[in-house]
């Protein structure tokens, strides 16, 4: 039981009027009346608090089975009140590592009704976390006391990579393949036959299938010519090498670089599996920490999520040559090799440059780096103060050194994508779909 603000106000009021009473009566009488008044207030508070216990509300919590890192995950509290209107303060003991939209929930629930309260948690790291109980304060009918109790509702929750983003990407890819968004299937794009359809105004005459048209005319009479529609080749191999070394431990926009890279890895894997390709993933630091052989099918995505989620970055220098050597030993046929890492400059990244150029021309190497928007913002914001100007100069130099390294990679035939961390997944998927459409694999 916790006194309300009204109780403190009444007690202070009793003390303040004591001098006035002493003027008209005596000081002992004033003290006696003040004490009597305070006792009455405290007794009423006790009665008010005890009465609440007969009408305690019921509170239950509902949350997603899998929380997504870097996303606002909705948490639902259902409050059921019987007979009387309940004024409540509810605090949910979510993991302390999470950000939260509303730490303390206030609600007034009418009698014989259920009210839903929603707030969001924002995890910034993956793993398993303890979720505590629910603290509920219910105000008495006289407004003098809060009934303070704890509802046992502790459990363990798991934070996964960005599953919300994967669901959105899956919908987007499904719309593309179903024809709602027709960018993924156009005349002349791809090498595999997809379908025959009627000729439309503006179609390229080179793609008319005259044999199929002749057979159709012989069967159905005068009909429009048939056009061959091609689509990108399937059952190719896509390998993703995800760096978990020292450079990937830095935080960018609230998440570690490794987490952004892991989200991009799963997004690219989803796109590859959706396009019918075989997808394999390797996670490396000084050695190949985890190797998942290439497979096809949507079931493989669940396998990738389960295997990759527990992995965390480490403060070790990465062995890029060793990782590339493992790929060469595992995969003899031509494939797309995507290396997700970070790059500082030519000097610091000499091993990365050597490893990627080793893959050409037998493989198609693709270097993906995660740019920090804060560095971009500092570099492109004019400053008048000396200290800020030096910081800006360093940022400009970092960006220039990165561009020199990227230029060397491109000269060696390595594909390059350098994008802000929050945009890396979408841009990487778009580049992959573009490569498929142009048959570069």
What are these regions (language model features)?
Residues 1-60:
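Extracellular/lumenal glycan-associated context and N-glycosylation machinery
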Residues 3-9, 210, 348, 432-441:
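C-terminal signal-anchor/stop-transfer transmembrane helix together with its immediate cytosolic
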Residues 39-299, 334-339, 347, 354-358:
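An amphipathic, basic-hydrophobic helix/alpha-beta surface used to engage anionic
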Residues 287, 370-375:
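Short beta-alpha junction loops
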Residues 290-319:
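Short, charged loop segments at secondary-structure junctions
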Residues 301-304, 374-404:
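Acidic, Ser/Thr-rich peripheral helices and adjacent loops at domain boundaries
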Residues 318-371, 418, 438:
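Exposed acidic/Ser/Thr-rich ligand/metal-binding surfaces
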Residues 381-384, 396-441:
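Long, C-terminal catalytic modules of enzymes
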């Amino acid at each position: 039981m916790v006194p309300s603000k009204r109780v403190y106000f009444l007690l202070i009021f009793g003390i303040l009027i004591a001098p006035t009473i002493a003027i008209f009566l005596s000081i002992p009488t004033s003290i006696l009346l003040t004490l009597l008044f305070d006792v009455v207030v405290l007794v009423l508070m006790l009665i008010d608090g005890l009465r609440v216990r007969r009408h305690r509300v019921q509170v239950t919590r509902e949350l997603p089975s899998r929380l997504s890192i870097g996303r606002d995950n909705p948490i639902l509290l259902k409050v059921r009140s019987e007979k009387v209107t309940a004024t409540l303060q509810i605090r949910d003991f979510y993991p302390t590592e999470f950000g939260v939209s509303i730490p303390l929930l206030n609600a007034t629930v009418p009698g014989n009704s259920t009210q839903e309260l929603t707030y969001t948690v924002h995890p910034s790291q993956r793993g398993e976390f303890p979720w505590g109980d629910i603290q509920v304060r219910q105000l008495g009918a006289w407004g003098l006391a809060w009934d303070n109790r704890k509802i046992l509702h502790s459990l363990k929750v798991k934070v996964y990579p960005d599953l919300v983003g994967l669901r959105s990407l899956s919908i987007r890819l499904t719309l593309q393949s179903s024809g709602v968004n027709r960018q993924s299937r156009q005349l002349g794009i791809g090498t595999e036959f997809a379908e025959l359809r009627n000729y439309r105004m503006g179609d390229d005459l080179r793609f008319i299938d005259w044999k199929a048209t002749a057979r159709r005319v012989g069967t159905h009479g005068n009909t429009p010519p048939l056009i061959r529609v091609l689509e990108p080749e399937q059952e190719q191999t896509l390998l993703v090498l995800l760096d978990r070394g020292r450079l990937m431990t830095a935080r960018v926009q609230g998440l570690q670089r490794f987490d952004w890279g892991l989200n991009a890895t799963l997004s690219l894997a989803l796109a590859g599996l959706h396009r019918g390709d075989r997808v394999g993933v390797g996670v490396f630091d000084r050695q190949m920490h985890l190797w998942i052989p290439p497979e096809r099918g949507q079931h493989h995505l669940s396998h990738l999520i389960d295997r990759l989620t527990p992995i965390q970055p480490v403060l070790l220098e990465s062995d890029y040559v060793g990782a590339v050597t493992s790929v060469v030993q595992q995969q003899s046929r031509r494939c797309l090799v995507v290396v997700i890492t970070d790059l500082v400059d030519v000097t610091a990244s000499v091993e990365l440059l050597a490893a990627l150029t080793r893959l050409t021309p037998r493989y198609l190497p693709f270097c993906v780096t995660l740019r920090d928007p804060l560095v971009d913002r500092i570099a492109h914001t004019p400053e008048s103060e000396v200290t800020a100007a030096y910081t800006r100069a360093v940022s400009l130099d970092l960006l220039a050194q990165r561009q020199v390294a990227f230029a060397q990679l491109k000269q060696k035939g390595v594909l390059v994508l350098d994008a802000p961390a929050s945009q890396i997944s979408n841009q990487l998927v778009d580049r992959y779909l573009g490569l498929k459409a142009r048959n570069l694999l």
